[in-house]
Amino acid sequence: RLVSNQSSSEISSLFTNHLNNICPKSCKIKVTEHHGGEPCVVNTDTKGYRSAYKAFQDVWKKDPVPTFDGGSIPIVALFKKELSLDSILMGFGLDEDAIHSPNESYGLFNFYKGIETITCFYQNFAENEK
């Protein structure tokens, strides 16, 4: 997972070089570099972002806390680069859900609140003038 000032090809190359440098002489390694996704930071001054922010306020009765968090979703950076569109990523999971682990879980409360939030987002987006 990369941050906004990194490129996947550069990090892949640095990682490969590091592995080759620390590999004991008695071992042989082969690193195959695959495609990489670029990082992306979205603009928070958009109709979509404001609509999502308000949806979280309306449904959860609290202000959302934006974070520099995310996973590897290469299409987000591609949408921004090729279409000049800022994606809206709304998370409803918790740290305790242990995402991608053998015992991953996802609470029904958050599932249903997520559906409600997305519905509210669409309504806000349709009503938002700017």
Q: PLM features: residue spans?
A:
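Metal-dependent amide/peptide-bond hydrolase catalytic core
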Residues: R1-E116, A126-K130
